[in-house]
Amino acid sequence: MQLKKPHFQPNKIANCIVIGGMIALGKTTIANTLANHIQAAKVVCELETNDQLVELLLAKMYERSDELLYSPLFQLYFTLNRFGKYQNNCNTINPTIFDRSIFEDWLFAKHNIIRPAVFSYYNQLWNRLAKELVNKHGVPNLYVILDGDWKLFEKRLFMRNRKVEIDNFTKNQLYFQNLHRVYTGFMEAVCNDFGINYCIIDAKLPIVTIIKMILEKLKLQKLDWKFI
């Protein structure tokens, strides 16, 4: 597996990497494990514990009770939240590992926001925020895109046993399938558009193998990071 470098190279590279990919493929576990191999690295998680607003919006979105209201609110909240997290943590003295990032939010919004006019507004907002991060703060040193087939996704989703996902799986099965079908290709396109070095890793590989592969790619970057 080769490190894939886009044709466009940005002016700024941030002091961070991102672990991204489809829902339930193990991003958080990999991010936390990887942090143990990079001196003083910190992980910025996708979901904060005890965030009642996130829990409410996530539940309402998956329940599909009022999609015209809650789906846009859900996407706007997550996008602005991740914008702030990236802005505040991407260039700290010590390396940061992000569990997903704003660069993935557009795809979720595309499949969640029903009204074209509302999505058009979101699309403009997302593009402005993403470009601001790229121009002012820099792109990640590496974007790890976890990939896996539908069976792996379904197995992992039920294994992690997040109640809101399990209870509403039938309502969201088509949504999950549509996301899964295009996720990796979309992320490749985003990385190429914004000039982000990336690699695609099979999520069904043992975590020891995945960590080894990521560390090998990071060492090729000649970063001023100390690996443990």
UniProtKB/Swiss-Prot annotation:
Organism (species): Mycoplasma genitalium (strain ATCC 33530 / DSM 19775 / NCTC 10195 / G37)
Chain positions recorded as ATP binding sites: G21, M22, I23, A24, L25, G26, K27, T28
Pfam family, one: dNK
InterPro entries to which the protein is assigned, alphabetical: DCK/DGK, Deoxyribonucleoside_kinase, DNK_dom, P-loop_NTPase
UniProt entry tagged with the keyword Transcription: no
A cellular component term, taken from the record's GO annotations: cytoplasm
One term of GO molecular function: deoxynucleoside kinase activity
Protein name: Uncharacterized protein MG268
Keywords for the protein's UniProt record, in alphabetical order: ATP-binding, Nucleotide-binding
